UniProtKB/Swiss-Prot annotation:
GO cellular component terms, A-Z: cytoplasm; nucleus
Disordered: region residues: 86-127, 150-345, 628-648
GO terms, molecular function: ATP binding; protein serine kinase activity; protein serine/threonine kinase activity
Enzyme Commission designation: 2.7.11.1
Name by which UniProt lists this protein: Serine/threonine-protein kinase DCLK3
Amino acid sequence: MGKEPLTLKSIQVAVEELYPNKARALTLAQHSRAPSPRLRSRLFSKALKGDHRCGETETPKSCSEVAGCKAAMRHQGKIPEELSLDDRARTQKKWGRGKWEPEPSSKPPREATLEERHARGEKHLGVEIEKTSGEIIRCEKCKRERELQQSLERERLSLGTSELDMGKGPMYDVEKLVRTRSCRRSPEANPASGEEGWKGDSHRSSPRNPTQELRRPSKSMDKKEDRGPEDQESHAQGAAKAKKDLVEVLPVTEEGLREVKKDTRPMSRSKHGGWLLREHQAGFEKLRRTRGEEKEAEKEKKPCMSGGRRMTLRDDQPAKLEKEPKTRPEENKPERPSGRKPRPMGIIAANVEKHYETGRVIGDGNFAVVKECRHRETRQAYAMKIIDKSRLKGKEDMVDSEILIIQSLSHPNIVKLHEVYETDMEIYLILEYVQGGDLFDAIIESVKFPEPDAALMIMDLCKALVHMHDKSIVHRDLKPENLLVQRNEDKSTTLKLADFGLAKHVVRPIFTVCGTPTYVAPEILSEKGYGLEVDMWAAGVILYILLCGFPPFRSPERDQDELFNIIQLGHFEFLPPYWDNISDAAKDLVSRLLVVDPKKRYTAHQVLQHPWIETAGKTNTVKRQKQVSPSSEGHFRSQHKRVVEQVS
């Protein structure tokens, strides 16, 4: 070779020429046993003194492999091998730089590069060569520390699984406990108290503050489990077994069942307490009872929302028994005073035609038709009010209310109820029959009435209202059509109040807008709440019509909205010549009834004490007023017909 410098390439070429079959032996020698750190230090120091670039050689996967390669070459004792090896390494370096091209001054992170390439099984090309023996030793220390850490983790995982199988640890959710294992601190962070810190954070120690301990697993919900599938399977089996044992030991109460249904997450923590020690089960029951009492206290503070609960029928029965009147009112309707009123007593479920024979129609309405009828045995005449159920459309309570109110009233000036029949399609009210017709027909016939007759009629009406109002019952539909005229044998007349379809017990202000437009009170239209006073307003309108033949509030254009505005204003006049012959006492009573403010309006008792009513009662034989001419009577009749059209 002459004076050529001794290089690794020349040694490699010489070795290949002399020992063509020894290349594989050199490669295999890399996996031999690693020598001591002292020997490796000498090898690398020698290489640095010889000024050959060790980093440009084929770098082994670990420090032990590098030392093994050098030891194999020294064991052979052939310098030409080193020359040929140097040439081979330089050839690979040229090819490798085409791929990697690392900067001369850059030094990639040692641990990250080694671990990443070791995982991919690649050879580490382009690593800096200026590594001292101290760095190699530290790499070996890191490897040993990692192995020690992995062994400690395996021991901890096995210890945790054994804890679960033994039934140890506080109340934790199974899934949260599994996820917590991956986020514990490594021994590097706390090397001095590695095992001691594990005991402090372990699930064997019973927590002083259960609330804080229960909140810990939530911090590690996003962590991943490092254990293998076998460890997870064994952990799940152990937890399931412990849970089964706990369920068999602990009694399951109805309160516990309801708590499981309402709040799954808190109960899952307590129900999955299968890794509790057996001797601590009593404390667990006490804690669960405390949680149950807190739940019950919260339920008492908050309104019950049964719609959001998901319970079985068995679990829900106690709650339904406690909340029965609120959740299922339809079963206790007859017994509940605050809900729908009970059905009236004495309703006969039979065919009414077997007992009564019907005659002509004497009246009709929105829901009913009134016919004459006669009892088949006694031959007594009655009025049969036939109510069609199909027209009620859920307003059956109105009929029941009417029946109950009529049954509660007993007065000479109120129509009496005799019997009630009911079938699947209709309801039959057998009422007192008044032969004289209603007051509306009487007004059409007579146009107007003398003051004594009008006073007697208002007296009869107010007597009926006194009886009703004393029972806090408001009629709400007073009008001439609902006042029946009974003609007595002495040629006198008596008014009887009928049709209690809109009657109602007044216990608080009513806001329902109802009635007939001509007779409706202003407080009903204002929708500010009303009471018994609306009947007295209607009585004032009826008195006005009885004295002059037309209503006090009229719309020239027959516009209902305009009529309602006039009623709410309360302006009316005693128009001449119709009121020229009417006494001031009669006008005074009308003025005291047609008052917009219901508090200032006359009551039924005050009407009966008015001088005009008292005088009419005492002097029933006062001369009738002078009859008006036929032409004026025809004028009043046509005007009253227009009023009737407005009412209809």
